[in-house]
Amino acid sequence: MADSDDEYDRKRRDKFRGERDSYRTERRDDRRPVGGSAGARDEWAERNPFRGAASAGGGGARHRPDYSDYRGPGARPRYGSPGRDLPPAKRMRPDWGDGDVRANPRFGGYDPYLMQAWNDHYQSMHSAYSHAGHAPPVRESIGGGGSDTLTQPAMLNLKQFLDTQDENISDSEVMRKYTEYKTDFKRQQLNEFFVAHKDEEWFKNKYHPEDSVKRSEEQRGFLQRRTDVFMELFENGTIGSVKVDSSQADALIRVLDTCVIKLEGGTDEDLKVLDEKPKDPVVYERKAEPMQSVKAVEKTINSPKDEITEADPLPVVVSTQRKPVGPVNSDEENWDDDNDAENSAPKKELAEDSKDSDSKPEDKQLNKKKTKKRKRNSSDDDSSSSESSSSSDEEKLKEKYDVEDGLRTEQKIEAEKDRQEATKAKQEPQSPKLDEVEGNDTTEPKGLDSKINTVEIDDTLKSPEISSNPIKNTDNGDSSKVEEDEEKPSVGKDNVVETETIDLDKVKDCQPRALHRTSSIFLRNLAPSITRSEIEAVCNRFNGYLRVAIADPLVERRWYRRGWITFMRDVNIKEICWGLNNQRLRDCEMGAIVNRDLSRRVRPANGITAHKQVVRSDIKLCAKIALNLDEKFRLWAEVPKDDSNSARANESSENGSGSTYGFNSQNPVLQNITDYLIEEASAEEEELLGLTGENKDTEGEPIERDEQLISVLDRLVLYLRIVHSVDYYNHCEYPYEDEMPNRCGIIHARGPPPVRVTNNDVQEYIKMYETKLQQFLTKTVPLSDEEIKNLGAKDAETEVEKFVQANTQELAKDKWLCPLSGKKFKGPEFIRKHIFNKHEEKVDEVRKEVQYFNNYLRDPKRPQLPEHPGTSKRPESESARGGGGGYRPPMYPPFSAMPYGFGPPMRGGGRAGRNFPPARRELPLEHQRRLIGYHDLDAPANSDMFD
């Protein structure tokens, strides 16, 4: 039961409350709070402060609100227009993205623009322009938090701008002021965009005077490296031996993989891996275990085998199930073969002896080895025995006071056996000369200790990667090789220590490395404020990290970026991905997922590309694209010697003529290219024989292949793909490919040709393809000084002067303060001199900021917010929204008008309403219709008439 009648009355349920509230714009935003239904009742209409005048008309202190209270703010007149008594229009479902503007948790609260605040700002700023006669702009909330697309604020159209001007202004003056308004509006948007993004790394890499130079030099270094690799393959005939046809997919993939191996620093020995059958890589790492905190305990290890005894038994004891070290793709049935690899070696050799009859000498060596082991065990000194006993005592104490003491007795017995076997294995590598071994052992374990300590710092994250050299050696699967390496000390005494620890890197060096295969992780969300160094700092904690690639931001994704992290092939990429998903950067979830390998690396294009006429056109386009890209990155710019020839070459390239291909560039791929650009036709023969092209146009002609032209085209296509990352047959560029997981991943090749093709199809294809490649054929020319001046370019000296004036403050007469240093001076000229002498770095920052902003303006393809839909596309009839003079249309269901009480019912949105100025002209005089009247001759003299 309620506490009082008022409380009971307040909580009474109104069935249609939500339906009525949705019609009123001032209640729509706060109709339903986020905090659930408990707090929502306090926000109902009875507590609305704007309803005071309507609810205080009678009754007690609290009365049940009448239905008349829901019809709008203000007191209703007794006798109103019948139009106001009409039932409200049907409530339409709001568009997607409308409604409450809240921060999107997907983007971590990042919204540098606060577009709703900007819309409110511009609405208040233009309040003089948009009075009651003008409806709000269409979809003003398109830039709000509920939408993924940010836009500029809506700009006033000419009709709205006229309302802000004087009545007696001339038409030419109106157009001049409106042009100035549009220019200022554009300047303001560019400046706001620059201020919002100038501190972000991707923006600095594009336009900052220092960072952009470093980035361009880095990219040029990548291109130079790719050019060297291509020229090496071009000279040894690898490029000329392959055709860019989908039927030769294997040969194309081999060429691309060869380039990748060369780019990774591989040798000719590593190229042999391409001849081997691809197989799953062996990963030297632990299997997935429950996450546990490992306490780093520093111990002195006498030999590398100690790492097995002191690091491995603890996980075996603590874990609820035995999970020894082994490769990921190893069989689960052989889980116990790797722990005692040294002790089981005799068994393996005996098994091999039963299979191979040639293994008898190995048995003899094995017997010798056993006798040596017995002698070593008997000749150990007291220090080694005491050390082993102390270590076993410590392990017993740890086992006794272990936190997880609920292990089964069988597991404890097995763990005890493992420790006993490990202590025996610890003594095996020692040679009879103990002094020499001990002297060498004191130097080696230090490196191992450092490795163990660094690994155990982040054991929860790097658990799949923790693996030491001895463990990797036992996992190698080829036990005979291991034993052969261990038997070498008997031949040479000087190499005793080197053979005790088998270096896995040396073993790998003997085999070709598959440098073209990697593992990678895809990051779906990267806030613009996250830098590359922060991502690298996180990834460096995992073994096998190679590089990271970050894409350019997109306005459709609120300037969020995507990223790719590349690791070596033999890592457990799923464990690393799990570790990355448990971390956040700048309160942003990166959304890490495992990036799959490429499914189809060679993809077919239209088969008409093999036709002779199309091939000749493609050669021309490829040569022009190669020239533009080479000139853009200055790949072959240092070789030309004759200034006159280079000048003529530049003029011809600017004019777009292809007559100088091969002359204005020292690129060997473009040499003598003009010989293949001249078309040939047997016109005389066709004329004499009376052959016409009508049959060809109707029936078509078979595909004509010219192998010589195709070989020239393939050379150009591979040059663009390998050097400039341009996939010609896909008419696109693969950006930042040198940082991606697959450096030369995908290529499009000519597909199966059709049987016949018409001349019309060929011409349409050539024209269409040239249109698609227009982005590569046209040069990007920066804007001139005059053009950027119109966009609001800044002057360095002017900005420095403003900086000096801003840091010159007058405290009293002959007393001035410099805020930068806090010192006081007698005059402003002394502060100016002080700033240029003591704060020169601040002045340089101002000059760099000016150059930074001007570089942004010079880019014709600069990133910026798209225009508001209301600015770019105006509705056909603005009077439908109450925007113009005249009468409103009938109130059909999709009607959306201004709130009641703003003017006469059927007039144009308050033209003769109370507290509003009288109606004014809204169009220039030449667009207005002059009212023509007539004079009745029979009417009296004082009658009304029009001029």
Swiss-Prot record:
<keyword id="KW-0597">Phosphoprotein</keyword>
<dbReference type="Pfam" id="PF04959">
    <property type="entry name" value="ARS2"/>
</dbReference>
<feature type="modified residue" description="Phosphoserine">
    <location>
        <position position="431"/>
    </location>
</feature>
<feature type="modified residue" description="Phosphothreonine">
    <location>
        <position position="300"/>
    </location>
</feature>
<feature type="modified residue" description="Phosphoserine">
    <location>
        <position position="81"/>
    </location>
</feature>
<feature type="modified residue" description="Phosphoserine">
    <location>
        <position position="303"/>
    </location>
</feature>
<feature type="modified residue" description="Phosphoserine">
    <location>
        <position position="357"/>
    </location>
</feature>
<comment type="subunit">
    <text>Interacts with cbp20, Dcr-2 and pasha.</text>
</comment>
<keyword id="KW-0943">RNA-mediated gene silencing</keyword>
<feature type="region of interest" description="Disordered">
    <location>
        <begin position="1"/>
        <end position="100"/>
    </location>
</feature>
<feature type="region of interest" description="Disordered">
    <location>
        <begin position="300"/>
        <end position="492"/>
    </location>
</feature>
<feature type="region of interest" description="Disordered">
    <location>
        <begin position="643"/>
        <end position="666"/>
    </location>
</feature>
<dbReference type="InterPro" id="IPR021933">
    <property type="entry name" value="SERRATE/Ars2_N"/>
</dbReference>
<feature type="compositionally biased region" description="Basic and acidic residues">
    <location>
        <begin position="393"/>
        <end position="427"/>
    </location>
</feature>
<dbReference type="GO" id="GO:0035194">
    <property type="term" value="P:regulatory ncRNA-mediated post-transcriptional gene silencing"/>
</dbReference>
<dbReference type="InterPro" id="IPR007042">
    <property type="entry name" value="SERRATE/Ars2_C"/>
</dbReference>
<protein>
    <recommendedName>
        <fullName>Serrate RNA effector molecule homolog</fullName>
    </recommendedName>
</protein>
<dbReference type="GO" id="GO:0031053">
    <property type="term" value="P:primary miRNA processing"/>
</dbReference>
<feature type="modified residue" description="Phosphoserine">
    <location>
        <position position="644"/>
    </location>
</feature>
<feature type="compositionally biased region" description="Basic and acidic residues">
    <location>
        <begin position="345"/>
        <end position="366"/>
    </location>
</feature>
<feature type="compositionally biased region" description="Basic residues">
    <location>
        <begin position="367"/>
        <end position="376"/>
    </location>
</feature>
<feature type="modified residue" description="Phosphoserine">
    <location>
        <position position="646"/>
    </location>
</feature>
<dbReference type="GO" id="GO:0016604">
    <property type="term" value="C:nuclear body"/>
</dbReference>
<feature type="compositionally biased region" description="Polar residues">
    <location>
        <begin position="465"/>
        <end position="479"/>
    </location>
</feature>
<comment type="similarity">
    <text>Belongs to the ARS2 family.</text>
</comment>
<feature type="compositionally biased region" description="Basic and acidic residues">
    <location>
        <begin position="8"/>
        <end position="33"/>
    </location>
</feature>
<comment type="function">
    <text>Acts as a mediator between the cap-binding complex (CBC) and RNA-mediated gene silencing (RNAi). Involved in innate immunity via the short interfering RNAs (siRNAs) processing machinery by restricting the viral RNA production. Also involved microRNA (miRNA)-mediated silencing by contributing to the stability and delivery of primary miRNA transcripts to the primary miRNA processing complex containing drosha and pasha.</text>
</comment>
<feature type="modified residue" description="Phosphoserine">
    <location>
        <position position="330"/>
    </location>
</feature>
<feature type="compositionally biased region" description="Low complexity">
    <location>
        <begin position="646"/>
        <end position="657"/>
    </location>
</feature>
<dbReference type="InterPro" id="IPR039727">
    <property type="entry name" value="SE/Ars2"/>
</dbReference>
<dbReference type="Pfam" id="PF12066">
    <property type="entry name" value="SERRATE_Ars2_N"/>
</dbReference>
<keyword id="KW-0539">Nucleus</keyword>
<dbReference type="GO" id="GO:0005654">
    <property type="term" value="C:nucleoplasm"/>
</dbReference>
<feature type="compositionally biased region" description="Basic and acidic residues">
    <location>
        <begin position="40"/>
        <end position="49"/>
    </location>
</feature>
<feature type="modified residue" description="Phosphotyrosine">
    <location>
        <position position="79"/>
    </location>
</feature>
<feature type="compositionally biased region" description="Acidic residues">
    <location>
        <begin position="330"/>
        <end position="341"/>
    </location>
</feature>
<feature type="region of interest" description="Disordered">
    <location>
        <begin position="855"/>
        <end position="892"/>
    </location>
</feature>
<feature type="modified residue" description="Phosphoserine">
    <location>
        <position position="354"/>
    </location>
</feature>
